[in-house]
C-alpha cells in the first residue's frame, strides 16, 4: 500500500513538472494563433475595402507621392481610406516640430490618430514581420497595457507607420507575457536583417542598422531624425531594468541606384514597461 502511494505521488509530481515545463510552449502557441487570426482579419478587412474613384473623392488619386511619404512599394495611386491616409501624412508632417514639446509618458499611451474617426473599424492597424526573430505580430495604435498585451504597440507622438522622409515609427512589445514569448526574439537580430511593416495600404521593408541596450527613461532616440525613414522596435530585458532596442532604416533612392545610410544613431528607451 505504501509503495502504491509513493508511486502515485511520484507520477503526480512528474506530471506537474512536465506541465510547468510545457506551459510556456503551449501558451506561446496559443498567443501566436491568436495573433495569426488578428492578422488574417486585418488582411481580409483591407482586401474587401474599395478605393474611391476620382469622381467620388479626388483626394484619393494623385500623380505624385507626397514629399514626406516614401515611394510606395505597391506603386499604386489609388488608396483605400484616403482621408485616413491624408490624416497620417499630415500628422507625420507636423510631428518634427511638436514631438519634443508634446512628449509625456501619457502621450505615448494614446493613439496619435483615432483611426475610427476616418472609417477604420479594425482594432489592428497593421502588423510587423521579423523572420530572423520569429516575430509576426499585429500592431495597435497607442502603447497602453491593453494593446501591448495583444501584440506590438505603436507609441503615441511617434510617426504613423506609413514611412517617408523624417519619420520614426516606434513600436513597443512585451518580451514575454503571461508565460508566452512575444518580442524576446529581438535579441537574435543582426545588422542587415529584414523587418517588414504592413499598414492598411502597403508593406514597407526596413533593415536593421543597430541594436543596443538602454536605460528605460531616456527619450531622445524615439524622436524623428531629419530626412531619414526609421523604424524603432524595443522590448524589456530580463530582468526588467533596461530596454533592448532595434533601429531599422529604409533604403534611400538616389537616381537609379539605391544606397544605404549606415550612420549609427544614439539610442533611447521609452519609460513604458
Task: Give the role of each language-model region.
Residues 1-4:
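Positively charged n-region of N-terminal signal peptides that target proteins for export
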Residues 7-273:
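Solvent-exposed, non-transmembrane regions of membrane-associated and secreted proteins
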Amino acid at each position: 500500500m505504501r509503495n502504491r502511494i509513493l508511486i502515485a505521488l511520484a507520477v503526480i509530481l512528474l506530471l506537474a513538472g512536465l506541465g510547468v515545463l510545457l506551459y510556456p510552449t503551449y501558451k506561446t502557441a496559443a498567443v501566436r494563433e491568436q495573433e495569426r487570426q488578428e492578422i488574417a482579419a486585418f488582411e481580409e478587412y483591407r482586401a474587401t475595402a474599395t478605393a474611391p474613384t476620382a469622381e467620388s473623392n479626388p483626394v484619393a488619386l494623385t500623380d505624385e507621392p507626397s514629399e514626406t511619404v516614401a515611394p510606395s512599394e505597391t506603386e499604386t495611386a489609388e488608396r483605400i481610406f484616403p482621408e485616413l491616409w491624408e490624416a497620417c501624412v499630415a500628422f507625420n508632417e507636423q510631428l518634427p516640430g511638436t514631438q519634443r514639446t508634446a512628449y509625456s509618458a501619457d502621450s505615448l499611451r494614446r493613439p496619435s490618430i483615432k483611426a475610427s474617426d476616418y472609417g477604420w473599424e479594425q482594432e489592428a492597424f497593421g502588423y510587423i514581420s521579423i523572420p530572423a526573430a520569429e516575430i509576426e505580430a499585429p500592431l495597435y495604435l497607442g502603447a497602453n497595457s491593453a494593446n501591448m498585451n495583444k501584440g506590438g504597440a505603436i507609441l503615441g507622438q511617434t510617426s504613423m507607420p506609413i514611412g517617408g522622409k523624417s519619420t520614426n515609427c516606434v513600436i513597443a512589445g512585451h518580451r514575454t507575457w503571461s508565460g508566452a514569448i512575444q518580442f524576446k526574439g529581438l535579441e537574435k537580430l543582426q545588422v542587415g536583417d529584414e523587418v517588414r511593416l504592413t499598414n492598411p495600404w502597403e508593406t514597407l521593408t526596413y533593415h536593421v542598422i543597430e541594436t543596443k541596450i538602454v536605460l528605460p527613461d531616456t527619450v531622445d532616440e524615439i524622436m524623428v531624425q531629419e530626412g531619414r525613414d526609421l523604424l524603432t522596435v524595443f522590448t524589456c530585458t530580463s530582468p526588467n531594468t533596461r530596454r533592448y532596442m532595434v533601429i531599422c532604416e529604409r533604403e534611400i533612392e538616389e537616381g537609379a541606384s539605391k544606397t544605404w545610410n549606415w550612420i549609427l544613431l544614439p539610442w533611447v528607451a521609452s519609460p513604458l514597461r
